[in-house]
From Swiss-Prot:
Described purpose of this protein according to its UniProt entry: Catalyzes C14-demethylation of lanosterol which is critical for ergosterol biosynthesis. It transforms lanosterol into 4,4'-dimethyl cholesta-8,14,24-triene-3-beta-ol. Favors C4 dimethylated substrates, the substrate preference order is 24-methylenedihydrolanosterol > 24,25-dihydrolanosterol > lanosterol > obtusifoliol > norlanosterol.
List of residues binding heme: C422
Lineage start: Eukaryota, Discoba, Euglenozoa, Kinetoplastea, Metakinetoplastina
Effect the entry attributes to changing I105F: Increases activity on norlanosterol and obtusifoliol
Naturally occurring in which organism (per UniProt): Trypanosoma cruzi (strain CL Brener)
Family indicated by similarity: Belongs to the cytochrome P450 family.
Residue intervals passing through the bilayer: 1-21
SUPFAM superfamilies registered for this protein in UniProt: Cytochrome P450
UniProt-recorded name of the protein: Sterol 14-alpha demethylase
Reaction(s) catalysed (UniProt annotation): a 14alpha-methyl steroid + 3 reduced [NADPH--hemoprotein reductase] + 3 O2 = a Delta(14) steroid + formate + 3 oxidized [NADPH--hemoprotein reductase] + 4 H2O + 4 H(+)
EC number(s) reported in the record: 1.14.14.154
Gene: CYP51
Membrane topology: Single-pass membrane protein
Pathway: Steroid biosynthesis; zymosterol biosynthesis; zymosterol from lanosterol: step 1/6
Amino acid sequence: MFIEAIVLALTALILYSVYSVKSFNTTRPTDPPVYPVTVPFLGHIVQFGKNPLEFMQRCKRDLKSGVFTISIGGQRVTIVGDPHEHSRFFSPRNEILSPREVYTIMTPVFGEGVAYAAPYPRMREQLNFLAEELTIAKFQNFVPAIQHEVRKFMAENWKEDEGVINLLEDCGAMIINTACQCLFGEDLRKRLNARHFAQLLSKMESSLIPAAVFMPWLLRLPLPQSARCREARAELQKILGEIIVAREKEEASKDNNTSDLLGGLLKAVYRDGTRMSLHEVCGMIVAAMFAGQHTSTITTSWSMLHLMHPKNKKWLDKLHKEIDEFPAQLNYDNVMDEMPFAERCVRESIRRDPPLLMVMRMVKAEVKVGSYVVPKGDIIACSPLLSHHDEEAFPNPRLWDPERDEKVDGAFIGFGAGVHKCIGQKFALLQVKTILATAFREYDFQLLRDEVPDPDYHTMVVGPTLNQCLVKYTRKKKLPS
């Protein structure tokens, strides 16, 4: 009886495997072309994970289409890899192309009822609150604060006249230090210094399972990192709660108008007249830092790595021509209005090696993309990595060329587009450009390998391979006046 049950189960499994492969490979005339599946359940996950750029380019080439469907863990994923069709992905409302289902993995980190785990009208209000705290009016004093933190870090960690550092690690520290200095009040920084905050974020990040986007059942596994995530978030919320109580006492006794990110979110009022809860405030602070920390770290690192490479000396010389004319203490206008080439360097680094491989949505209602109709139930994805390597839009795409312009309007999607365009774009540019200008004015750098590092596609947010980022720094003899 037992053997018969096993045979029956195996037979059912084999039949289902054959059915699933045949079902995926059989399409309607209006469906995007599919890249054939031969391995049931896993689909193309191994090929995609090994080298996503090479695999997606092969699909696009073999299928002769910039819009195509692959299978990842048994889930149909339709990729919009034609820059001409980007608007078809970024324009539809959340109710048609929904981010909630694919970003359920973030709920333990941000919290229930926050961002993608909130109803869409509430999510839009929360993002608007965050956007109001990242306006140009609030940026005016940020540049001196960023420079102060960068110089403080360099003085404490690059103590000798020359030495060897891991640039990716050091950029990560400078990004979190400068973000905390700009966005948090003094009371919050005293209770939650940048190092401690980075540790809490790391614990929360370690709980994420990227494959759960395509295989949601993975989220139900009782993994130990899930418990660590809950503990880290609870600790952060406890610290914020204590600071809020202390601020309320100060405000009762004197005029206290702390204008940091925490203060702004605490004053935010929903349309129904209610204020954000402590749980929601904590989630939005985590979301803001989570969204920016890795992407800005990676962008700063790539920009510096390319600029210090000998083959890019003409670009470094051009950067120096731009930044060396400014006083040692920069201001907002210097950074945002008078450094166009530095911004080109940053954007080209994002273009060549975008931190996010794909931006995804769940198709809730059939949507037309080009001559195809993407069926309900697909995950639809737009890949900055694939689109930024489109030969028509960006000829010779692996060449780092800050003076290139996109040949197809809307091809660059490094900061998103449409209704979900990155609300932290201006802060990120301010932060990265200030770090670049300060570091290259005061130090010379030498990459300790022949070529720029390879992208590490095994991390959730893709940056240069960590062990390839060793760099020699040399303090300049005389700082610019």
